[in-house]
Amino acid sequence: MRLKTLATHPVWREPRTVFGVWMLTGVIFAIVKLLIGKYNNYKIFEGVYWHAIEGLTLYGDHYPEYYDSNHYGVLFSLIIAPFALLPEWLGMILWIAGNTALLFYAISRLPLSSTPKIIIYWYSYCELMTAQGVQQFNISVAAFILLSFVLILEKKDFWAAGIIMLGTFIKIYPIVGLAFFFFSRQKVRLLVSCLFWGLVCFVIPVLYTPGIEYVISQYIDWFERLKVKNMLNMFADRSEEH
């Protein structure tokens, strides 16, 4: 009876409670993975930054630094940079926490009342834990898609385009945000903004990597790597996908 009372307590319907549970789970997963030494995805992620500034291929074999291959675009090196520059244990904890907080914020922005949002928070919690456990960036990918939808509804197409292009240049999948084109009341502005932000996202890595030739070569290698990945996906363990 006490367990039932606890499970139905109003505190679980408070957004701050959900946020606390989400963040606590992320920190616990990070600490456990650090202690047992199983955080290969994060090693790949931080490696993207160091390899980019050193002008090394982002998609080759970097064993024993880590196993498996990177599947993220050159721009990802900028996103992971603040975490890669920190001590590994701190960077990984903040990485998981940051991704988690972004998804929580994105859901909070949906044009829904409190109750549906709480349902979404708890319904997605199990999948969130899986992603936290393997340090996936997919948490933020989901956030990008949600935020692009919200911003388009709010007639902030310029910023929606920025999020769509940022996500696309990092991991392709957020390009599905363009499906929200039909919800836009500023369609031309959205398309022009996508072109602008696409150019910005392409140029930014040139500023801190060896140069434009390196960036172009890495984008070519990235597309080739994605082709291989797509062929293998049907046989892959999706829980380990990064």
PLM feature segments, named:
Residues R2-W159, S184-E241:
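Primarily membrane-embedded glycan-assembly and transfer machineries that use lipid-linked glycans
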Residues F158-F182:
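Membrane-interface alpha helices of multi-pass inner-membrane proteins
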